[in-house]
Swiss-Prot record:
Source species of the chain: Phaseolus vulgaris
Complex formation: Homotetramer.
Post-translational modification summary for this protein: N-glycosylated on Asn-80; contains xylose.
Gene Ontology MF: a single term: D-mannose binding
Further comment: Antibiosis properties of legume lectins are proposed to be due to the lysis of epithelial cells of the intestine by binding to the carbohydrate moieties of these proteins.
Name of protein: Leucoagglutinating phytohemagglutinin
Coiled-coil ranges per UniProt: none
Gene Ontology annotations of biological process type: defense response
Role, per record: This insecticidal carbohydrate-binding lectin is toxic for the cowpea weevil.
Protein's gene: DLEC2
């Protein structure tokens, strides 16, 4: 897991000068319910995997399943008193498996949501949004396995979502059934640059998407961070959505340095 090694370096640099009680770091190589807020169908397996969607009585992915899981403690993403915004980095490994008699749907996402947020619509909305024009105060990186004609590009993709399921930026994603995917997401508050990369170590393939996002204008001061996933609403399109490990670090910054961006470039260059 080359990306895991470089992400460890990223964490160490991010936290070298940490001096605030609101600087956060955690690392789950196995999950337990103690440190998580589980919603709807999400659960932790006996082997410590985070299962965001569940199975039917035949042991296959259930149609219309929706699950979300967030770190139990709120994260301060910006400071109303000083105006500073946090830089963050997160790394996780997930696995999506599709039965032989089905196609994949709908996907999973890493998300920053308001504290106390409740699940939204299932299916293509990934449990994070719905069909209204509401301000969801949500930023997400989606790993979308099914084309939804009303808002998706025509290919499976990784997308950056800001208050809407219609991504502001996407990149093609060559989904590999049943293979572990390693993800690294970084946010540099000095440049507002959000970068997400996915690597399949077994395939030696990688995918990257990035765009600028002003978190302070989108999110509340305190957020919950975690995952949301859904299966398809039709019998022929279902999948498992399991997160195997997860690390996260955030640090409030004065915005005068770009160490988050430099570190992101370093790590991404190493794992490509």
């Amino acid at each position: 897991m080359a990306s895991s090694k470089f992400f460890t370096v990223l964490f160490l640099v991010l936290l070298t000068h940490a001096n605030s009680s609101n600087d956060i770091y955690f690392n789950f190589q196995r999950f337990n319910e103690t440190n998580l807020i589980l919603q709807r169908d999400a659960s932790v397996s006996s082997s410590g995997q985070l299962r965001l969607t569940n199975l039917n009585g035949n042991g296959e992915p259930r149609v219309g399943s929706l699950g979300r899981a967030f770190y139990s403690a709120p994260i301060q993403i910006w400071d109303n008193t000083t105006g500073t915004v946090a830089s963050f980095a997160t790394s996780f490994t997930f696995n999506i498996q599709v039965p032989n008699n089905a196609g994949p749907a709908d996907g999973l996402a890493f998300a920053l949501v308001p504290v106390g947020s409740q699940p939204k619509d299932k299916g293509g909305f990934l449990g994070l949004f719905d069909g209204s024009n509401s301000n969801f105060h949500t930023v997400a990186v989606e790993f979308d396995t099914l084309y939804n004609k009303d808002w998706d590009p025509t290919e499976r993709h990784i997308g950056i979502d800001v208050n809407s399921i219609r991504s502001i930026k996407t990149t093609r994603w060559d989904f590999v059934n049943g293979e572990n995917a390693e993800v690294l997401i970084t946010y540099d508050s000095s440049t507002n640059l959000l970068v997400a990369s996915l690597v399949y170590p077994s395939q030696k393939t990688s995918f990257i998407v990035s765009d600028t996002v002003d978190l302070k204008s989108v999110l509340p001061e305190w957020v919950s961070v975690g995952f949301s996933a859904t299966t398809g609403i039709n019998k022929g399109n279902v999948e498992t959505n399991d997160v195997l490990s997860w690390s996260f670090a955030s640090k409030l910054s004065d915005g005068t340095t770009s160490e988050g961006l430099n570190l992101a470039n370093l790590v991404l260059n190493k794992i490509l």
